[in-house]
Amino acid sequence: RRNRRVLFSQAQVYELERRFKQQKYLSAPEREHLASMIHLTPTQVKIWFQNHRYKMKRQAKDKAAQQQLQQDSGGGGGGGGAGCPQQQQAQQQSPRRVAVPVLVKDGKPCPA
């Protein structure tokens, strides 16, 4: 018997995000004060902060992996970059999809 998912108002999310930018972790009294200001329970605020910290950590990890992939896949070379803007745009739209070269298929090395 779980509680239903509650969608926060834009004003509540704005206030949560504004406070998160100032401070990634809240003490219990700070959490209670913020919760009463935006009409949420302290538990809702606590969980939102936990989820948001995880989301930021995951986004940073994905961004670092994407930058590493771009560096590894020939960031140099200079000319002939006609397809690059489209490729970069596609990568920005789906940051968690990563191209992985096939090195071994059916136990046999693939030609490079």
UniProtKB/Swiss-Prot annotation:
Residue ranges of DNA binding: 1-60
GO CC terms: nucleoplasm
Biased composition range(s): Low complexity: 84-93
SMART domains, per the entry: HOX
Bias-annotated ranges (Gly residues): 73-83
InterPro entries hit by this protein: HD, HD_metazoa, Homeobox_CS, Homeobox_NK-like, Homeodomain-like_sf
Pfam family, one: Homeodomain
Superkingdom assignment: Eukaryota
Keyword set, alphabetical order: Activator, DNA-binding, Homeobox, Nucleus, Phosphoprotein, Transcription, Transcription regulation
Record PTM: Phosphorylated on serine residues.
One Gene Ontology biological process: positive regulation of DNA-templated transcription
Subcellular location: Nucleus
Region Disordered, residue ranges: 59-100
GO molecular function: DNA-binding transcription factor activity, RNA polymerase II-specific; RNA polymerase II cis-regulatory region sequence-specific DNA binding
Transmembrane segments: none
PANTHER family in the cross-refs: HOMEOBOX PROTEIN NKX (PTHR24340), HOMEOBOX PROTEIN NKX-2.1 (PTHR24340:SF33)
Annotated family: Belongs to the NK-2 homeobox family.
Role this protein plays: Transcription factor that binds and activates the promoter of thyroid specific genes such as thyroglobulin, thyroperoxidase, and thyrotropin receptor. Crucial in the maintenance of the thyroid differentiation phenotype. May play a role in lung development and surfactant homeostasis.
UniProt name for this protein: Thyroid transcription factor 1
Organism field: Cavia porcellus (Guinea pig)
Taxonomic lineage of the native organism: Eukaryota, Metazoa, Chordata, Craniata, Vertebrata
